[in-house]
C-alpha cells in the first residue's frame, strides 16, 4: 500500500504500526437545577486545578527533552486555560442556561476554537487544535477519565492516529517512537514542530 501525504518533519522511519485511538469523550445530556449550580462550578474548579498541574508536568518534560521553545507551548496552554473569558463563558452557561459543566465546557471550547479554525492563516488555524486539546483535558478531568497519553508504549513503533495534540507529542519517548503519521494537522501544527525537534519523521 502506498499512501501520499504532506511531510511535517523530514526523514525515513521503519517500525511496527501503533494505532492510537483516543477514548471518546461522551458529553452528558442533562440540565442542572439552581441548587446544583454551585457543585457544577466546583467541578470546573477542581478540573482546572488538575489540568494546570498536568500541563505543568508536560511543560517540564518538554523543557528537558526539547528545550525552552517547546516548553513555552505549554506555558501558553496554561495561560489560555486560565483566560477569564473561557472560565466566564463556561460559568455563564451553567448559571444562566443550566447546562451541566461538561456540556458548557464543550460548547465554549468549540466556540473559541472555531474562531481560529476559520482563519486564513494556516498557523492560526492550528491554534484551534491547541484550544481543543485544552478543552479535552478539562472535560476528561471533569469526567474522571485517565489523561490520554503515549508514554506507556514499548518497542520501536510508528504512531498512526487521526491527529495528535501537542500534549500527546510531548509525552512520546523518542527512543521508542520512530515516526508519526496523522490524517489531520500539517507542517505548522505543534505536533509537527515537536516531531522535528526530536528528529522524528512525520
Residue positions per predicted region:
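Non-catalytic, soluble scaffold/interaction modules
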Residues: 1-202
